[in-house]
C-alpha cells in the first residue's frame, strides 16, 4: 500500500510569511486569535499549578487546598512533599471520600513530567466531584527546585538544580 504524506500547511494571511525557502515550522499553523488563546490558557491554569506556587502556599500554613501524592507506598517512602496526603491513584475510588474534604480543592502530583499518575488521580477525583489541579513537574521538580521533602528515614533537602530554579533563595524566576 502506497501512502503519501501531505505537505505541511502553508501560512495563511493571518500569519506572518516565513522568510527563506521553507515555511516556518512555528507558524505553519498560525497562532490562535487573542481571545481564543486567552480562554485556552486560562483553562490550562484552571487545571495546573507548579511546584513553586504549591511551596509558597504551603509555607503560609493555610494553603486552601489539599495536596495529594498519587504514587505507590514505596515511592512515598522514598520521598514526598511534607504535608501531602498519600492516596495512590488506584485507591482514589475507595478512599477519597474518607481522606479528602470535597469542599476543598485538591492538587495532585506523581513522580514527574513523564508520569501521568497525577492526571489519572485528578480524573478519578473530578469524577467523584472534587475540584482538582495537577502540580506540574511532580515530585521530581519539587526536589530539583530545592524544596524540602520527607522520606521514611526523615526529612531531606537537595540543592536546587540551576536548570530548574534560581540558585539563590532571594532570586525569583519572574514567572
Label each residue range with its predicted role.
Residues 76-82, 97, 142:
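Short loop/helix-cap segments at secondary-structure boundaries that form the rim of catalytic
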Residues 61-67, 82-83, 105, 130-131:
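Short active-site oxyanion
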Amino acid at each position: 500500500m502506497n501512502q503519501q504524506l501531505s505537505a505541511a500547511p502553508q501560512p495563511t494571511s493571518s500569519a506572518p510569511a516565513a522568510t527563506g525557502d521553507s515555511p516556518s515550522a512555528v507558524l505553519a499553523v498560525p497562532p490562535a486569535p487573542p481571545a481564543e488563546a486567552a480562554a485556552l490558557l486560562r483553562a490550562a491554569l484552571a487545571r495546573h499549578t507548579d511546584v513553586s506556587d504549591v511551596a509558597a502556599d504551603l509555607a503560609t500554613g493555610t494553603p486552601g487546598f489539599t495536596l495529594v501524592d498519587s504514587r505507590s507506598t514505596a515511592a512515598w517512602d522514598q520521598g514526598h512533599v511534607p504535608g501531602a496526603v498519600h492516596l495512590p491513584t488506584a485507591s482514589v475510588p475507595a478512599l477519597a471520600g474518607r481522606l479528602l474534604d470535597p469542599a476543598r480543592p485538591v492538587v495532585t502530583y506523581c513522580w514527574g513530567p513523564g508520569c501521568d499518575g497525577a492526571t489519572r488521580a485528578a480524573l478519578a477525583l473530578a469524577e467523584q466531584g472534587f475540584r482538582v489541579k495537577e502540580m506540574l513537574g511532580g515530585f521530581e521538580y519539587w526536589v530539583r527546585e530545592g524544596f524540602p521533602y520527607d522520606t521514611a528515614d526523615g526529612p531531606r533537602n537537595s540543592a536546587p538544580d540551576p536548570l530548574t530554579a534560581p540558585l539563590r533563595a532571594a532570586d525569583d524566576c519572574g514567572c
